[in-house]
A protein has these predicted regions:
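Acidic, Ala/Val/Gly-enriched low-complexity intrinsically disordered segments
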Residues: 8-10
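N-terminal catalytic cores of NTP/NDP-binding nucleotidyl/phosphoryl-transfer enzymes
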Residues: 13-42, 46-52, 118
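Hydrophobic/aromatic beta-strand patches that form the interior of the parallel beta-sheet core
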Residues: 18, 47, 84, 114, ...
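Short, solvent-exposed loop/turn segments at secondary-structure junctions
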Residues: 23-24, 53-55, 120-122, 146-148, ...
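N-terminal Rossmann-like or analogous alpha/beta NTP/dinucleotide-binding catalytic cores
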Residues: 52-139
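Short, flexible loop segments at boundaries between secondary-structure elements
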Residues: 136-154, 163-176
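Conserved small/polar residues in nucleotide/adenosyl-binding loops
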Residues: 181-183
Length: 184
């Protein structure tokens, strides 16, 4: 699809948000982030992807099937939210880069993927498997809090120009409050 603006031709791919996370448990902050990302980045939809067996977290006190069902129930009334079982069905460790590759293969080149993640995840990106390849294959929307800006700046700087172009920020003031009252 082309968007003609004067003599410039701009190819407009559809934007789809992929919200990966343990959702252990899912809380209102996750839903606020998904809704804000959908609105601010003009996403066609937001696909929630509960993590399977991850290399970075070993704290799934709620089973992956129960987390999947919890997210599914929470988003069922929102027409621009959906859920994918791609990671919970994967055997062995689940890496974000593999998920994004598989989604690109399923959806085709007409979609630009915007991976929605929290501050901690984006700050840890320099340690992720195939992080450069991952950043080549999708954009990141970082749901950040003002208190975490320095860690995020360091992660963006690690990736240089590509980090500046592909890591975007989503500020939702409610998250600062929610992080203070969240009970683990």
């Amino acid at each position: 699809m082309c968007n003609y603006s004067g003599s410039d031709v701009v190819f407009m791919a559809k934007r789809i948000g992929v919200f990966g996370g343990s959702f252990n448990p899912l809380h209102i902050g996750h839903l606020i982030v998904a809704e804000a990302a959908w609105q601010e980045f003009n996403l066609e939809q937001v696909v929630f992807v509960p993590t399977g067996d991850t290399p970075h977290k070993n704290m799934h006190h709620i089973s992956k099937i129960d987390r999947f069902e919890m997210v599914k129930m929470a988003i069922k009334e929102n027409p621009h939210f959906s859920i994918s079982s791609i990671e919970i069905e994967r055997k062995g460790l689940s890496y974000t880069v593999d998920t994004i590759k598989q989604l690109h293969a399923e959806w085709g080149s007409e979609y630009n993927i915007y991976f929605i993640a929290g501050t901690d995840a984006v700050a840890d990106m320099p340690t992720w498997k195939y992080n450069e390849e991952l950043l080549d294959s999708c954009h990141f929307i970082c749901a950040s809090r003002p208190s975490s800006e320095e860690r995020i700046k360091q992660a963006v700087a690690y990736f240089g120009k590509k980090g500046c172009e592909k890591i975007h920020f989503l500020r939702t003031p409610e998250l600062e409050i929610l992080s203070l009252i969240h009970i683990s």
